[in-house]
Amino acid sequence: MKRVIRLRHVGIAIALLALVVPGVAMGGQTKGTIKIATQSPLSGEQSAVGEGIKLGAQLAIEQLKGPIEKAGFKVELVPFDDQAKPDVGVANARNMITDKDIMAVVGHYNSGVAIPSSEVYKEAMLVEISPANTNPVVTDRNLPNVNRVCGRDDVQGAVGAEFAKGLKIKTAYVIHDKTTYGQSVAEFFRDNAKKAGIEVIGFEGTEEKSNFDPILTPIKAKNPDLIYFGGIYSQGAPLFKQAREKGIKSKFLGPDGLDSPDLVKIGGQTVVGMYYTTAAGPVAFYPKAKEFVKMYKEKFKKDPQPYSAESYDSTAIALKAIESAIKAAGGKMPTREAVAKEVPRVKYAGITGEIEFDGKGDRKKAGYFILQVVSEDPAKWDDNKLLERKEIAPPPLKK
């Protein structure tokens, strides 16, 4: 009889514990699992930056998940490999929206993948916070679930053209990779270069990745002061390398797609001295980045990639929005719609500075940087010389 009474007392104690301690129940159960997904290229030529986006998100979740766990929920990262391909990104997005536990997406790296994928997210009001997608279309569609912490290519192209004018460039030849991102930023550079009085003597796109002779031979004959490439480092590096090997002496300039230590890993000495604009300043230029870099290196045994810090900030904003949505739901699992509505309300002092979104999901003031490559050693990529830094508001939404 005493044994029965004792067991009864134990049962009552456990029941009371479940009532007074949030998230504690029989068997250590929680109120549920909240997932944050990433979409970025985790395989292929762009996997270095894509992995950096994933790891930035992972570090943010590990460091900042506390308030959501105290509310009784587990928090998990779910990484997806979009392979830098629009069809893969869309297929992944379809899979994401079927998992009701996924409350936010941090991604992508390629705007050409982000734009169609975000249309799928919109069907389920799954919020996307982009660390790296700079094409204006990303936010100019005014989708209620799409936001970004980085800048825009219409501004980046203008910044590049203004810099080229300062270099006394008279003639430029513009090449792009035929992607949504690469062609767009190349067009913005071309148009702004013309306004700045620079003669654009050629504009063409190519999907070639190994033999650029058919493009470079006529360029050598035209002898432009500048070659601008709109695209990603994996294609830009061999283009620039072959240009130098052909004896072309033009200056080189490109956008943030070139911002990777793999540029010098592929291009070596031939890309030393070239210029690039980026919407992701090296983390050393951010006052709050020192601790982030330390924790990143300790955790992953490697340096952060471009957009790792932006991914951390994007994830932090997602976590803040989820926390607010949980409170608004009385401590229950929030809806995706509720999370999406909370994201624009977040004002966050992040690694990359103060972050606040405008009505269409753009950062109210984004950073733009102009750098020069100083070494062929990939380990010294963060030592590249900062030439200019600007904080610029996005253009208003066109009616």
Give names to the regions the model predicted.
Residues 2-399:
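Extracytosolic ligand-binding ectodomains
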